[in-house]
Amino acid sequence: MFDQLDIVEERYEQLNELLSDPDVVSDSNKLREYSKEQSDLQKTVDVYRQYKQNKEDIDEIVEMLSETSDKEEVDMLKADMNELKDTLPGLEEELKMLLIPKDPNDDKNVVVEIRAAAGGDEAAIFAGDLYRMYTRFSEGLGYKTGVIEMNDSDHGGFKEISFTINGQGAYSKLKYENGAHRVQRVPETESGGRIHTSTATVAVLPEAEDVEVDIKDADLKIETYRSSGAGGQHVNTTDSAVRITHLPTGIIATSSEKSQIQNREKALKVLKARVYDMKLQEEQEKYDSERKSAVGTGDRSERIRTYNYPQNRVTDHRIGLTIQKLDQIVEGKLDEIIDALTMSEQTEKLKELNNVDL
């Protein structure tokens, strides 16, 4: 582990020099790249230096103890040494966690797609509940959300809805939401009081940068059409809605707000995210064939969570977590679940690192 930490510290010092280089300062792309890399290493270097400083202080105290026989001074030095020794295990654990490879997409904005699945009208209502839950959660973090495309249900909620969440670390917070969500509750229209089960699927796609997805204009088919609201009513008087098809993959993205220019930009953003996501899914499948992760972020058909309204209970099936706070969770209080999922994934990765004698 310490060999790797030395390499990290050495790279940090190299970046300090590079960021002072006039050639780098004049190149905005390199300056941004190196600044981000240095920022990513900062915490690890700070903790490692604190660890080394504490070790050095302990060695100094040991040397001082060998040079004195004054009881009061010996007692004071030993107390200081024990206090420093007590910090080492915690710092070592923190360093192990900091060495866990970071998901390169964690800091990105996301596109979230929610689709009603089994359960008819109730599934659409549940899709609406999930949308509200995620927007409230995002607002609590200071993130901005924006609807790209929605297909309303006649009885409330959405048959499907896609929207953006923009903010530092959005993907790191939302990536565990990929999969099938199940709800168990008595519908308002159910006179017999029977509990119905419905599902909705959630896809969380990291926004793709141009350098990550090369999409040529010649590979795009762009169409405009008239958007319609619930019940088929026309909500636009012009053909402002946009549909973009990526011909090599057949991936389609649409946006149907009022501005055709904004729709084109939004649809293209979603298209890039979907093409990038397809690439990530292929890489994930390759990884999963070698190791099966308990906390998946890929399989969209995997049932990941159940929301049981009568018992005010939410269960995340991937880690066996059950929380009796459904009323708070659907209002956007997702932190307890997300923190548990993050810790579970980090623990798995730490085990893998330990297996290769890090």
From Swiss-Prot:
Intracellular or extracellular location(s): Cytoplasm
Highest taxon of source: Bacteria
Keyword Protein biosynthesis recorded: yes
UniProt PTM: Methylated by PrmC. Methylation increases the termination efficiency of RF1.
InterPro entries in the cross-refs: PCRF, Pep_chain_release_fac_I, Pep_chain_release_fac_I_sf, Prokaryotic/Mito_RF, RF-1
HAMAP family linked to this entry: Rel_fac_1
Purpose: Peptide chain release factor 1 directs the termination of translation in response to the peptide chain termination codons UAG and UAA.
Protein's name in the database: Peptide chain release factor 1
Species name: Staphylococcus carnosus (strain TM300)
